[in-house]
């Protein structure tokens, strides 16, 4: 039995990322031993990379009212379709920039098999801050970090990730609310020893940490694609400008999404109260 599988989370509107993603994947991780699942909504990847299963997570499902499933619903359905307990989470705009240390990924996946109490191991320098050593090469992470449950490249125990999902949440709301749910549930996330790697130096999985921001290309992607002979019509999306304010329609949509997360907010209040009661009880003993 394989020790882990790989989930590349995406949506059909990001189809333009799939070919460059897997072209760089084949170049920088040609001997990847794990099965790769692409979490599409309805579409099927038809590129040259053969070891890719398009999940088409929304196909055949009734999605009333909205017409589209939420990010969390799609991720839940994908995780339920996978066959391993440990999942390497990636996204379609995490474009590889150098060779992957597949041996390190395998070692940490094996550690998760050996220690079923580990819910998550962050593998990137963009992960959560380290606190203290726990296992060889692994540190505990800071549960007070706002993005404790972040969506960067990580090994997840499938059931742990499923337990943090709430169907109404987007990726950004999951990172915000899911981080607090993980803290209040006393999940102890781990991160690789920060002294071993950095953004500029060694990385287990070297990649651009987000190739698309608010639907637009992140500038360094153009240089990466040019260097590898990857053609892309960048004018379709345009490039992200941090000085550009989102249009009024986008702000209205965001406000509507915030309103839809009222259940998450109520749940967190209850979890926080219980967490603080337990903390006070422990402090009084």
Residue positions per predicted region:
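Catalytic core and acceptor-binding pocket of nucleotide-sugar-dependent glycosyltransferases
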Residues: 148-216
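Short, acidic, metal-binding catalytic loop of nucleotide-sugar glycosyltransferases
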Residues: 23-33
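Conserved donor-nucleotide/metal-binding helix-loop-beta segment in metal-dependent transferases, i.e.
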Residues: 98-129
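Short beta-strand-to-loop acidic/aromatic patch adjacent to the donor-nucleotide binding site
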Residues: 85-95
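N-proximal low-complexity "stem/linker" segments adjacent to membrane-targeting elements
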Residues: 1-20
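Membrane-proximal basic amphipathic "stem/tether" segments
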Residues: 1, 227-285
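Active-site-proximal specificity loops/subdomain of glycosyltransferases
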Residues: 37-86
């Amino acid at each position: 039995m394989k020790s882990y599988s790989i989930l590349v989370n995406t949506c059909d509107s990001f189809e333009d990322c799939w070919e460059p993603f897997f072209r760089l994947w084949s170049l920088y991780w040609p001997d990847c031993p794990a099965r790769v699942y692409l979490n599409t909504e309805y579409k099927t990847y038809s590129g040259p990379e053969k070891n890719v299963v398009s999940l088409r997570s929304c196909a055949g499902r009734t999605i009333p009212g909205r017409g589209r499933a939420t990010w969390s619903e799609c991720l839940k359905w994908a995780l339920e379709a996978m066959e391993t307990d440990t999942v390497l989470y990636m996204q379609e705009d995490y474009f590889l920039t150098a060779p992957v240390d597949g041996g390190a990924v395998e070692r940490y996946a094996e550690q998760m098999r050996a220690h079923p109490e580990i819910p998550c191991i962050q593998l990137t320098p963009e992960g959560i801050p380290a606190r203290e050593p726990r296992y060889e090469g692994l540190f505990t992470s800071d549960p007070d970090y706002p993005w404790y449950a972040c969506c960067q490249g990580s090994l997840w125990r499938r059931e742990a990730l499923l337990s943090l999902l709430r169907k109404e949440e987007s990726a950004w709301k999951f990172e915000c609310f899911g981080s607090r749910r993980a803290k209040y549930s006393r999940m102890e996330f781990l991160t690789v020893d920060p002294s071993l790697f950095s953004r500029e130096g060694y990385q287990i999985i070297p990649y651009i940490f987000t190739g698309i921001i608010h639907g637009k290309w992140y500038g360094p992607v153009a240089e990466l694609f040019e260097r590898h002979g990857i053609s892309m019509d960048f004018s379709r999306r345009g490039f992200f400008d941090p000085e550009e304010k989102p249009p009024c329609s986008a702000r209205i949509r965001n406000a509507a999404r915030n309103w839809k997360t009222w259940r998450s907010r109520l749940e967190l209040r209850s979890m926080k109260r219980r967490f603080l009661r337990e903390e006070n009880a422990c402090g009084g003993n």
